[in-house]
Amino acid sequence: MASTLTVRKSLSDRAKARARRQARGRKKIFGTVERPRMVVTRSSKHVFVQVIDDVAGNTLVSASTMEAELREMSGDKTAKAARVGTIIGERAKAAGITKVVFDKAGNQYHGRIAALADAAREAGLDF
């Protein structure tokens, strides 16, 4: 019987593959003042979103599941990610941002990333 270590890819190979995907997407995606880049970072427990103006190198608005409101929220990680999408949409609208370029940072458009994106669209962001 083969051990799980020989069946699974090593974590470093997965990390390298994700870094390649991220670099491939990042060289095509660039945020401007009119259409800043909305980058989603995902960890095993949390989701972080920043709306970035790449010309000036400034973060315009941000939200994450680390905020007090969402830490106390009950539910699964996908529901919390959807709430983060709603919050980032509201904060972006308050800052005068309606259009963004979506950067999933090498992650698959599935699960928490998709839930966040759909909630941000419903909150009024166009991407």
Swiss-Prot record:
Residues 1-26 are annotated as: Disordered. Keywords: Ribonucleoprotein, Ribosomal protein, RNA-binding, rRNA-binding. This is Large ribosomal subunit protein uL18. InterPro entries: Ribosomal_uL18_bac-type, Ribosomal_uL18_bac/euk. One of its GO terms (cellular component) is cytosolic large ribosomal subunit. It comes from the Bacteria. GO terms for biological process: translation. One of its GO terms (molecular function) is 5S rRNA binding. Belongs to the universal ribosomal protein uL18 family. The keyword Ribosomal protein applies. This is one of the proteins that bind and probably mediate the attachment of the 5S RNA into the large ribosomal subunit, where it forms part of the central protuberance. The gene is rplR. Part of the 50S ribosomal subunit; part of the 5S rRNA/L5/L18/L25 subcomplex. Contacts the 5S and 23S rRNAs. Residues 17-26 have a biased composition (Basic residues). Pfam families: Ribosomal_L18p.
